[in-house]
């Protein structure tokens, strides 16, 4: 397909599709393509992302990595690293106020008891739970609990929890 340069207005005639993207790397089925008011990307002929006038759309099978946190007296969470986190508690801890918060960010923090168990977790001021009641973690050795969160503002994280999930 030829590319037409339209003066200072941009490039035209490069629409493509998921199976034959307009802009390709070494694979002819991987790249970026365009449709009306849409920019999308494909890998091996399958659409992996789509950006249109409503925002970014991710297919149902999209997944985010679970980022390991460092166990410490105050557990630090850098929200710029991802959305989902995991830590094994090696003692009674505090979940610190995260850095790099973005309103609307959401995810899960998995909390695992170490082999001893009976570890407790306190929460710094940004973490907000229903009715102001923080969860009491499952104390069984190796138990897993989860904090489900959405960042409301840069100083307020709305949370809920799931206890003893595995």
What residue spans do the PLM features occupy?
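Short, intrinsically disordered N-terminal pre-domain segments
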Residues: 1-15, 163-166
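Beta-strand-rich receptor-binding modules of extracellular spikes/adhesins
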Residues: 2-10, 27-59, 156
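Extracellular/surface-exposed low-complexity repeats and stalk/linker segments enriched in Gly/Pro
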Residues: 10-30, 90-94, 126-134
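Short, hydrophobic/aromatic-rich segments at coil-to-beta transitions
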Residues: 16-22, 37-38, 80-84
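Residue-level marker for the onset of beta-strands and adjacent loop->beta junctions
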Residues: 19, 28, 37, 47, ...
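Extracellular beta-solenoid/beta-roll
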Residues: 56-81
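A mid-sequence, solvent-exposed acidic-amphipathic segment
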Residues: 77, 85-88
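Acidic, glycine/polar-enriched metal-coordinating patches/loops
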Residues: 87-166
